[in-house]
């Protein structure tokens, strides 16, 4: 099967964070709530079109969150990486003791249906 992609196809990153305790997850949530808007303001100037912080709730007894970023183009993705690396560096300092597991994915949007 062959997929034809528009040159302007959106790129996205989707990262899942698994914590050992609810307290660690809530700290992570608070850090993003306190800093996410400011970070997105910087990223949107470089082509980030969406930021979404999520709490994963459907697996009982686990403490998981995820972060989604969407970008206009491969160039936008590359331009946002420095800002994200700086933010992540500071974030990881605060969460160093949390011993969290991060699962990262980079995606090309092939089909996106919306209302």
Q: Where does each model-flagged region fall?
A:
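Short structured motifs
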Residues: 1, 50-53
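Short flexible/disordered coil segments
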Residues: 2-3, 15, 106-115
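Surface-exposed beta-loop interaction hotspot
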Residues: 4-9
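Active-site-flanking beta-strand signature of metal-NTP-handling nucleotidyl enzymes
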Residues: 10-19, 66
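Short, surface-exposed ligand-recognition loops at beta-strand->loop->(often short) alpha-helix junctions
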Residues: 20-32
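An amphipathic, aromatic/His-enriched active-site/gating alpha helix that lines ligand/cofactor pockets
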Residues: 34-50, 60, 68-108, 115
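A short beta-turn/loop motif at secondary-structure boundaries
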Residues: 55-61
């Amino acid at each position: 099967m062959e997929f034809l992609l528009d040159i302007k196809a959106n790129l996205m990153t989707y990262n899942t964070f698994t914590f050992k305790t609810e307290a660690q997850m809530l700290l992570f949530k608070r850090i993003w709530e306190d800093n996410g808007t400011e970070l997105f303001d910087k990223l949107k100037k470089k082509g980030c079109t969406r930021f979404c912080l999520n709490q994963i709730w459907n697996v009982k007894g686990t403490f998981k969150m995820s972060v989604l970023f969407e970008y206009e183009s491969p160039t936008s993705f590359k331009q946002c990486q420095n800002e994200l690396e700086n933010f992540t560096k500071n974030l990881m300092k605060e969460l160093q003791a949390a011993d969290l597991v991060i699962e990262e994915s980079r995606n090309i949007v092939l089909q996106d249906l919306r209302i």
